[in-house]
């Protein structure tokens, strides 16, 4: 009985109805899509509502820090994920430099000043993907890989209609979910997400990926409007 209780605590699996889990998936995700596809100023209030619902549902259904991957265990073992992201970023930056598409005007300090907000947003996205949606899909679907694929599918659809970010989000989302299931540590995945996202931002021209915007922001993107904004707003990925 002890090992069973430990497994339940680790995986965040509880005896509860699938209907409740589906509602906890569909309602927050519907609000996320509302934020993405709603114009301002309504978007601001929907964003607040969506964040509040996620926090409330997480608090009510609290699975524990270990289940959500907010722990020290396996952190060092999974740091290779960050190294792999850095290696991929190095190759992408070198290729962008060769193709003259690199948008990099400084060193680490410049990156920190321009992309610190996106780094935080990357962690929030990984929390939603793994600690929120994946845990619930694991209780709804019979196989873990199915839960990983379903979570990645939602993550990818939230990046519509960007033809660059949709496939990138699907691939990264699926791999990240599988890695989360293996190591159950969110921190390296959040760091890798930030690295890969910033790499896309500085290697692909804003006119091509619409400044990494999604939803209504992607459709309303204007290069002329883009260049009248400060540097950090022009090329920072947009939450």
Each language-model region and where it sits:
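Interfacial transmembrane-helix boundary/kink motif in multi-pass membrane proteins
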Residues: 5-28, 48, 62-91, 106-114, ...
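Function-critical hydrophobic alpha-helical transmembrane segments in multi-pass membrane proteins
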Residues: 103-157, 161
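Hydrophobic core positions of alpha-helical segments in small-molecule transporters
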Residues: 81, 150-151, 191-192
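Functionally important transmembrane alpha-helices
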Residues: 166-226, 230
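Membrane-interface starts of transmembrane alpha-helices
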Residues: 41-49, 113, 142-151, 185-188
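N-terminal, membrane-interfacial amphipathic/helix-forming hydrophobic leader that caps
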Residues: 1-65, 201-239
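Membrane-embedded alpha-helical segments of multi-pass membrane proteins
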Residues: 45-53, 111-116, 120, 124, ...
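Juxtamembrane "helix-exit" motif on the non-cytosolic side of transmembrane helices
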Residues: 34-39, 93-104
